[in-house]
Amino acid sequence: MNGFLVCQRGNFLKWYGTSSFSRTANRGVHISAEARINERIRVPEVRLVGPNGEQVGIVRIEDARKLAFDADLDLVEVAPTAKPPVCKIMDYGKFKYEAAQKARESRKNQQQTVVKEQKLRPKIDDHDYETKKSNVIRFLEKGSKVKVTIMFRGREQARPELGYRLLERLANDVAEYGVVETRAKQDGRNMTMVIGPLRKGKK
């Protein structure tokens, strides 16, 4: 390999030399949580990236493993389909831990999405309407989606326009807090619409 690398156990110091491989070439590389590491990498040579993103160049796999060992880190294959494969010296245990943490946080955020329901009658009076509207706003401010249900009875079922108008009015009145995700539609005797909370910064 071109140049030389100064290493101490547990401390990857600096690579001295030149390389035609761009220092930014490894940015944005996706590392699989099941990537091959250390002795599992069985190719004659690799393009090596240091722990701080420095480009070491193309080296023999034996040399790459030794550099990782001397730095008290792991050799991780980050681009197996490249020719030669790209490997990075890094703390693989720390990487897997952080990846697992991100996955758990993502699942937690998905599970926290709650759908509340608010029911209205098509001929609701103004006072009740304001109360229902306040409930919808409160749900949206807490980050919940709201399923708004218009309940028709008897002859009211022959006048779906009452439901459409009421839902349109409500959507306009809460537009500062939420956006319609599912437009008004008939659902048996009822009519439903789903409003989702606005993302932060979009109010």
Curated annotation (Swiss-Prot):
GO terms for cellular component: cytosol; membrane. NCBIfam families: infC. The keyword Protein biosynthesis applies. It comes from the Bacteria. Gene3D superfamilies: Translation initiation factor 3 (IF-3), C-terminal domain, Translation initiation factor 3 (IF-3), N-terminal domain. The gene is infC. PROSITE patterns: IF3. SUPFAM superfamilies: Translation initiation factor IF3, C-terminal domain, Translation initiation factor IF3, N-terminal domain. This is Translation initiation factor IF-3. Monomer. Keywords: Cytoplasm, Initiation factor, Protein biosynthesis. It comes from Corynebacterium efficiens (strain DSM 44549 / YS-314 / AJ 12310 / JCM 11189 / NBRC 100395). PANTHER family: TRANSLATION INITIATION FACTOR IF-3, TRANSLATION INITIATION FACTOR IF-3, MITOCHONDRIAL. The keyword Cytoplasm applies.
